[in-house]
C-alpha cells in the first residue's frame, strides 16, 4: 500500500492557479467596465422594464384577460354531473350492432 495518490495542492497553490486561469477574463472585464461604465447592470433591470411593470399587467388576448378576471372573482365553474356513469369504449361495434340506415328523401344524382 505504498502507492498513494498524489497529495492535493494546498489552498494557496489552487488559488494561484485559478487566478492565472481567470486573470485574462477579469482583465478584459475590467477594461470593458472602464470603457463603458454606464452599461453596468442595474439591480432592478432596465428602465424600460421597470416602467412596463409599473403600468400594470398586459394581456396577450381576450382569453388571457377573461381567465385573469375569473381568477379574481374566484368563481366556480359548473362541473359535470357526478351521477353520469356512462362508460365509453367498452366494446368494439360490429356491422350487426349498428342500426339500419334510413333511406334518404333526396335521390342521389350518382344512383342514376
From Swiss-Prot:
Pfam hit, one: Endosulfine
Family annotation (InterPro entries): Endosulphine
Modified residues (Phosphoserine): 62, 104
Composition-biased stretches (Low complexity): 1-11
Gene Ontology molecular functions: phosphatase inhibitor activity; protein phosphatase 2A binding; protein phosphatase inhibitor activity; protein phosphatase regulator activity
Localization per Swiss-Prot or TrEMBL: Cytoplasm
GO biological process: cell division; G2/M transition of mitotic cell cycle; mitotic cell cycle
PTM annotation: Phosphorylation at Ser-62 by MASTL/GWL during mitosis is essential for interaction with PPP2R2D (PR55-delta) and subsequent inactivation of PP2A.
Keywords: Cell cycle, Cell division, Cytoplasm, Mitosis, Phosphoprotein, Protein phosphatase inhibitor
PANTHER family: CAMP-REGULATED PHOSPHOPROTEIN 19 (PTHR10358:SF4), ENDOSULFINE (PTHR10358)
Job of this protein: Protein phosphatase inhibitor that specifically inhibits protein phosphatase 2A (PP2A) during mitosis. Inhibition of PP2A is enhanced when ARPP19 is phosphorylated. When phosphorylated at Ser-62 during mitosis, specifically interacts with PPP2R2D (PR55-delta) and inhibits its activity, leading to inactivation of PP2A, an essential condition to keep cyclin-B1-CDK1 activity high during M phase.
Assembly and interaction partners: Interacts (when phosphorylated at Ser-62) with PPP2R2D.
Protein's name in the database: cAMP-regulated phosphoprotein 19
Species: Taeniopygia guttata
Source taxonomy: Eukaryota, Metazoa, Chordata, Craniata, Vertebrata
Amino acid at each position: 500500500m505504498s502507492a498513494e495518490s498524489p497529495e492535493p495542492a494546498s489552498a494557496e497553490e489552487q488559488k494561484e492557479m485559478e487566478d492565472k486561469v481567470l486573470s485574462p477574463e477579469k482583465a478584459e472585464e475590467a477594461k470593458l467596465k472602464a470603457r463603458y461604465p454606464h452599461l453596468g447592470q442595474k439591480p432592478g433591470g432596465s428602465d424600460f422594464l421597470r416602467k412596463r411593470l409599473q403600468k400594470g399587467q398586459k394581456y396577450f388576448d381576450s382569453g388571457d384577460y377573461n381567465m385573469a378576471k375569473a381568477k379574481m372573482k374566484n368563481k366556480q365553474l359548473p362541473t359535470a354531473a357526478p351521477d353520469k356513469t356512462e362508460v365509453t369504449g367498452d366494446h368494439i361495434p360490429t356491422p350487426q350492432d349498428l342500426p339500419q340506415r334510413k333511406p334518404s328523401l333526396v335521390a342521389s344524382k350518382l344512383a342514376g
